[in-house]
Amino acid sequence: MAPWAAAQLWALNPLRALWLTLAAAFLLTLLLQLVPPGLLPGCALFQDLIRYGKTKREGQSRPAVCRVFDVPKRYFSHFYIISALWNGFLLWHLTQSVFLGVPFPNWLHGLLRILGASQFQGGELALSAFLVLVFLWLHSLRRLFECFYVSVFSNTVIHIVQYCFGLVYYVLTGLTVLSQVPMDGRNAYVIGKNLLMQARWFHILGMLMFIWSSVHQYKCHVILGNLRKNKAGVVIHCNHRIPFGDWFEYVSSPNYLAELMIYISMAVTFGFHNLTWWLVVTYVFFSQALSAFLSHKFYKSKFVSYPKHRKAFLPFLF
């Protein structure tokens, strides 16, 4: 472990503790799914909680008590509406603070202090946090566009707990980014307002990685959407088919892989050394790996001719 990471792990603030807990929870869940069937007692409620969309049990195999908590999967758009509004709001305040010297509202910098924003900020650059917040906002806008104009949602569902977590997730993510901004002792004014003088090589690299990952994720969502449309772009069914093209040639869920790469691009933009964001990346890795693994199992069980060389999440590895 890098010395800077080891030193910072000894002083977990609330945000780091939260992301570490989430990452550990999803790691444990993934490991439980990797255990061969029959070695551990099954739990329908647990399985229903961790699955969504096509990977949920269909028909009468799901207990009635589980179906009570169903929410349409098309409500995914709500996550990105909240994210676009909230992170746009945070970006507006950060822009005002950086360029106009306007302090954050009292309630906002008070909340950031509670989350631990006043700790470990000596080595951060304001430009890094500004760019990452821009990336997060643009990512939310693109995903919102895809929900309305690219994706074709069937009548599949998600659990109400997953829905509520999704609503909170991007609020928490935006606050995590903002908490990395170097500020004065009162956590009200941004330190280092001359952003152009802060530009580093890793900002360029992070931006290129973000664009590259976003383009591939968009392509994958277009491929998935087109499986349910005719050549004129009209939706003709909501069945599942085997996707081909782009990163689908390597993994079953390249959209999840691209999501991970997007968050890694943000870690690069932070200069590689931001422990808080690497904990976010760790959570994203295990949560997306879990979803990809369940999706991979679905494809393999449904299609006899499913390509055997495809992995679930990481090309050639997993």
Curated annotation (Swiss-Prot):
Pathway(s): Protein modification; protein glycosylation
This protein's record includes keyword NADP: yes
Subcellular compartments: Endoplasmic reticulum membrane
Segments on the Cytoplasmic side according to the record's topology features: 1-19, 102-119, 178-194, 287-318
Membrane-spanning segments: 20-40, 81-101, 120-140, 157-177, 195-215, 266-286
Alphabetical keyword list: Endoplasmic reticulum, Lipid metabolism, Membrane, NADP, Oxidoreductase, Transmembrane, Transmembrane helix
Gene Ontology biological process terms in this record: dolichol biosynthetic process; dolichol metabolic process; dolichol-linked oligosaccharide biosynthetic process; polyprenol catabolic process
The protein's Enzyme Commission number: 1.3.1.94, 1.3.1.22
Entry membrane topology: Multi-pass membrane protein
Keyword Transmembrane: yes
GO molecular function terms attached to this record: 3-oxo-5-alpha-steroid 4-dehydrogenase (NADP+) activity; oxidoreductase activity, acting on the CH-CH group of donors, NAD or NADP as acceptor; polyprenal reductase activity
Pfam family, one: Steroid_dh
Major subcellular site: endoplasmic reticulum
Family membership: Belongs to the steroid 5-alpha reductase family. Polyprenal reductase subfamily.
Protein role: Plays a key role in early steps of protein N-linked glycosylation by being involved in the conversion of polyprenol into dolichol. Acts as a polyprenal reductase that mediates the reduction of polyprenal into dolichal in a NADP-dependent mechanism. Dolichols are required for the synthesis of dolichol-linked monosaccharides and the oligosaccharide precursor used for N-glycosylation. Also able to convert testosterone (T) into 5-alpha-dihydrotestosterone (DHT).
Protein name as annotated: Polyprenal reductase
Gene: SRD5A3
